[in-house]
Amino acid sequence: MGNGVQPLDPVAIQIGSISVKWYGVIIASAVVIALLLALSEANKRKMDKEIIVDLLIWAIPISIISARIYYVIFEWDFYKNNLGEIVKIWHGGIAIYGALIGAVLTAIIFSRIKKISFWQLADVVAPSLIIAQAIGRWGNFMNQEAHGAETTRSFLESLHLPDFIINQMYIDGAYYQPTFLYESLWNVLGFVILLIIRRTKIRRGELFLGYVIWYSFGRFFIEGMRTDSLMWGDFRVSQALSLLLIVLSIGIIIYRRLKMNPPYYMEDKFGKVVKKK
């Protein structure tokens, strides 16, 4: 590059003509960490860990496919003339909301087949989902995508960011806002909050709904800073969906508390309180 700033190599491993990109490595790492955390949460909740493994065997590939389909739908003007690019997810282009939709639908169907509580499953995996999203954003970082508007190097330095982040935000002759980082840090904070509130007297399902509210709230504002938002006419799709999910989640919490009296989070499926560890 003209000013000597070099981006990080997006390729993690090169074996002959076969290359493994950091994007894929980071996404795979996020999945593994999410699985291990979900198994740990299941153990605390006295839930059979095989249920979590069986769920994720289905949910992971379906979520990846739905995330890609979601992205392709809203970028169809490009993909209709580049059909071969649709399967090349290592080039980037998977939407978190698409993945969430796929995961929720899978969990609903799975819970009905297994005759277990969807809300109990959702609560167990909620911390895993948000930390996986925090990690996954670094895949966007390696691909130099999901960034914000143009800015200056001095502004990035004022944030006390390490040089490797600042340099990676230098794209095509300009520096950009590291919105990937803002969202990653927001998700890490959300992860910590979920771990704290799961020990309080919340009702079953509210940990997952709290995750949806927290993530959607942050995503709404961060999305407004991005330059690569998926659009539907004049609307940013993720902002519209964020508002919808916030309202829907709050409405579900209120309705369930008023009409359904759901059990507390720390009660297992037999109604017994699980001892806190």
From Swiss-Prot:
Residue ranges crossing the lipid bilayer per the database entry: 18-38, 51-71, 89-109, 116-136, 177-197, 205-225, 235-255
Keywords linked to the UniProt accession: Cell membrane, Membrane, Transferase, Transmembrane, Transmembrane helix
Cellular component, GO, one term: plasma membrane
E.C. numbers: 2.5.1.145
GO biological process: lipoprotein biosynthetic process
Family: Belongs to the Lgt family.
HAMAP family in alphabetical order: Lgt
Protein name: Phosphatidylglycerol--prolipoprotein diacylglyceryl transferase
Organism expressing this protein natively: Listeria monocytogenes serovar 1/2a (strain ATCC BAA-679 / EGD-e)
Name of the gene encoding the protein in the UniProt record: lgt
